[in-house]
């Protein structure tokens, strides 16, 4: 029997609709004859004329032909590549409106995904001092395009299939973002330019580092060119031929100081990191976020605090300046090792770090059984902290500060804490970690009733 496939004929002509909301990827949403239609580069409240570009059983896609009514929140995108490059999704929306939208997204998801959870107070949003040049971490694709006769370096196009042809990136730190053309031209001089797949960028307080992911070996001449490029631009260059364990630093060579990249999360603390380690992309907001987390924990000198999903100690080490003891727990052993080294290098003696998978049972772990805590900080990845929240009564903590990069996961976990574990949501708010994108960084405070 042959397979039957659903085929819908694309509607022809020009249609009109009002945009009522934004999708998770920043496209405008309109309801046309009861069916959801996604229309890019539109904002809620706008009325547009459009034509269909794609249709499926449950939704349609379209493009704007004319703006009949424009939103007061509409601005001219600061980047010439905005409509092509997929790196940003909200440059056509004022930064104030972006924050308001993200704040409302948080409140809505707490209510609907968290089954009625509402914060007693809305925290004022943490704003960044610069919505351009803020991004210090990125993975940039590299591809030789024969039709264009050149190397492309950048993010994928909005459709996700090809790399966008860009000459600069305004959200990347300008030490890299202003040099996209220079970097792509340099790669063209290498013998294996068609076999370089990716550049992983990490920028500390003073210098950029670049991991060059290559699929074929470099020649000696290539290596000399890479060293010269690094020296001329004050870059640290790393090479990666296969998995993460193959990464090594090509330039500078030898036992140089400093041995690692580093940043200061708070006064008096230097955290060393490798370019493939997880660090926050926005240094300005990171410092403000840490300060806010410490304020919301309401730390006294007798507090014992546990920091789960602690990474390199981004929160743990600054918290240690205010608390009696702090324990950091992280799933990646390499990061735990670096966190311990950082504590030693900064002469911090009231912290300790442990490696543990926090997505499975941890009741047999030393850090769980041999210490008592009265407060907790959570900073999980996008998956959230469901296992921890399901077992929160075993920690017996009075206050929880939860930092989240995924509002849906936070809302789910808030529902667990508030509806089944006897906590109340004191306050919640957003932080402008990712301007011009739909990514939402948020923070919430829970207190035991």
From Swiss-Prot:
**Record-annotated residues binding [4Fe-4S] cluster?**
79, 85, 88, 169
Q: Where is the TRAM domain?
A: 1-66
Family matches, as NCBIfam families: PRK13168.1, rumA
- The record lists the organism as Francisella tularensis subsp. holarctica (strain LVS)
Give the GO biological process terms.
rRNA base methylation
The highest taxon in the source lineage is Bacteria
- What are the positions of the active site? 405 (nucleophile)
Recorded E.C. number(s)?
A: 2.1.1.190
* Broadest EC class assigned to this enzyme: transferase
Q: What PANTHER family does this protein's entry cite?
A: 23S RRNA (URACIL(1939)-C(5))-METHYLTRANSFERASE RLMD (PTHR11061:SF49), RNA M5U METHYLTRANSFERASE (PTHR11061)
Going by the UniProt record, its keywords in alphabetical order are: 4Fe-4S, Iron, Iron-sulfur, Metal-binding, Methyltransferase, rRNA processing, S-adenosyl-L-methionine, Transferase
The uppermost taxa in this organism's lineage are: Bacteria, Pseudomonadati, Pseudomonadota, Gammaproteobacteria, Thiotrichales
Q: Which family does it belong to?
A: Belongs to the class I-like SAM-binding methyltransferase superfamily. RNA M5U methyltransferase family. RlmD subfamily.
Please indicate if the UniProt record lists Disulfide bond as a keyword. no
Please give the function described in this protein's UniProt entry: Catalyzes the formation of 5-methyl-uridine at position 1939 (m5U1939) in 23S rRNA.
**Name of the protein in its database record:** 23S rRNA (uracil(1939)-C(5))-methyltransferase RlmD
Q: Which InterPro entries match?
A: 23S_rRNA_MeTrfase_RlmD (IPR001566), MeTrfase_TrmA_CS (IPR030391), NA-bd_OB-fold (IPR012340), SAM-dependent_MTases_sf (IPR029063), TRAM_dom (IPR002792), U5_MeTrfase_fam (IPR010280)
- Keyword 4Fe-4S found: yes
Which positions bind S-adenosyl-L-methionine?
A: 280, 309, 314, 330, 357, 379
As its record notes, the protein acts as a catalyst of:
uridine(1939) in 23S rRNA + S-adenosyl-L-methionine = 5-methyluridine(1939) in 23S rRNA + S-adenosyl-L-homocysteine + H(+)
GO molecular function list: 4 iron, 4 sulfur cluster binding; iron ion binding; RNA binding; rRNA (uridine-C5-)-methyltransferase activity
């Amino acid at each position: 029997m042959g397979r039957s496939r659903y085929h819908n004929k694309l509607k022809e002509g020009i249609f009109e609709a009002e945009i009522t909301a934004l999708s998770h990827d920043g496209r405008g949403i309109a309801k046309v004859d009861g069916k959801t239609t996604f229309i890019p580069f539109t904002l809620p409240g706008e009325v547009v004329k459009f034509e269909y570009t794609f249709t499926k059983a449950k939704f349609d896609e379209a493009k704007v032909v004319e703006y009949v009514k424009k939103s007061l929140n509409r601005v001219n995108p600061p980047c010439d590549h905005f409509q092509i490059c997929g790196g940003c999704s909200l440059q056509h929306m004022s930064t104030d409106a972006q924050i308001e939208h993200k704040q409302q997204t948080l409140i809505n998801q707490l209510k609907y995904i968290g089954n009625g959870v509402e914060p007693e107070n809305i925290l004022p949003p943490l704003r960044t001092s610069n919505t351009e040049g803020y991004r210090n971490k990125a993975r940039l694709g590299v591809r030789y395009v024969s039709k264009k006769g050149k190397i492309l370096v950048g993010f994928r196009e909005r459709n996700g299939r090809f790399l966008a042809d860009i000459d600069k990136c305004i959200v990347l730190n300008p030490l890299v973002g202003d040099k996209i053309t220079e970097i792509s031209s340099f790669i063209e001089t290498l013998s294996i330019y068609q076999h370089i797949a990716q550049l992983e960028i990490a920028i500390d307080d003073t210098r950029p580092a670049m991991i060059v992911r290559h699929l074929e070996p470099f020649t000696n001449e290539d290596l000399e060119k890479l060293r010269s490029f690094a020296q001329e631009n004050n870059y640290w260059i790393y090479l990666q031929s296969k998995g993460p364990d193959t990464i090594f630093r090509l330039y500078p060579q030898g036992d140089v100081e400093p041995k690692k990249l580093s940043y200061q999360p708070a006064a008096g603390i230097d955290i060393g990191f490798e370019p493939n380690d997880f660090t926050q992309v926005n240094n300005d907001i990171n410092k403000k976020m840490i300060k806010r987390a410490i304020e919301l924990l309401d730390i006294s000198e007798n507090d014992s605090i546990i920091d789960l999903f602690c990474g390199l100690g981004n929160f743990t080490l600054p918290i240690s300046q205010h608390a009696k003891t702090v324990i950091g727990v992280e799933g990646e052993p390499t990061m735990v090792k670096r966190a311990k080294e950082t504590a030693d290098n900064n002469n911090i003696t009231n912290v300790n770090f442990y490696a543990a998978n926090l997505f499975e049972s941890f009741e047999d772990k030393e850090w769980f059984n041999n210490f008592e805590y009265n407060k907790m900080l959570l900073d999980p990845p996008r998956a959230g902290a469901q296992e921890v929240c399901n077992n929160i009564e075993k920690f017996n903590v009075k206050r929880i500060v939860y930092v989240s990069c995924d509002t849906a996961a936070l809302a789910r976990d808030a529902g667990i804490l508030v509806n089944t574990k006897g906590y109340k949501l004191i306050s919640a708010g957003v932080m402008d970690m990712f301007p011009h994108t739909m990514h939402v960084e948020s923070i919430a405070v829970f207190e035991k009733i």
